[in-house]
Amino acid sequence: VETHGVRRKGVPGSNPVWTGAVVDRMQRMVLRDRNNPCVFMWSLGNEAGDGSNFMEMKKAALALDNSRQFHYEGDFDLTKSDVISRMYPTKDIMEKLGNKQPITISLYDNIANQLAADSKPIKAEMYEGKPVVLCEYAHSMENSLGNFQEYIDDFEKYDNMCGGFIWDFVDQALHVKDENGNDNYLYGTDFQGQEPHKLIDIPNTTAMTGSNVYFCANGIIGADRKPHPQIVEVKHGY
């Protein structure tokens, strides 16, 4: 489940209107994937806020498969997730996570919360029995991953760090041939020909949507599966 832009409005939250839909989605995923040995953990969703509906999803999944642990990025009280899930932590936050130190929310975190990642405060006692997973890190946009090795070093340094998931694997674009037979990979509003516009009015930000920006094109490989330059850095680190 991901509700991203409307999760602040309690969707799905604890609203009973959404309970049946999100539980059904969870059940269907478990039934589809529970016999695949590569699936080592169930995820209740991503960027969808918090609320009792996620506990209902977990209960439904456990009824079908009680052999796996659970992950949920939006679990603020860690009653649903078996891991501490974070997005895009800075170097100092990585050190606090590795040393199991309390984390408070800064002004920067509050701004980030309005855009995407849910930066959660963490009390020292919440680390007990909960390893740390970066559900998104190393945002692979343009000429990126310059400090990728620093994350790898921290994964190796701290025993409570499981690792993380690079955002993301492949450019999110659709293959279309133009009238001359040339290959094109389209995303955003390429199909409507709209001009890009500011996503949110925060000074010095580049959060944009539209046809001439590249927020969907941030994979370590292209939509045609050809490697981007930063995949060399990933290979070196891993």
Please report, for each region that a protein language model flagged, where it lies by residue.
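Conserved active-site neighborhood of enzyme catalytic/cofactor-binding cores
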Residues: 220-221
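Substrate-binding/catalytic cleft of secreted carbohydrate-active enzymes
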Residues: 1-216
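Surface beta-strand/loop "capping" patches
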Residues: 224-238
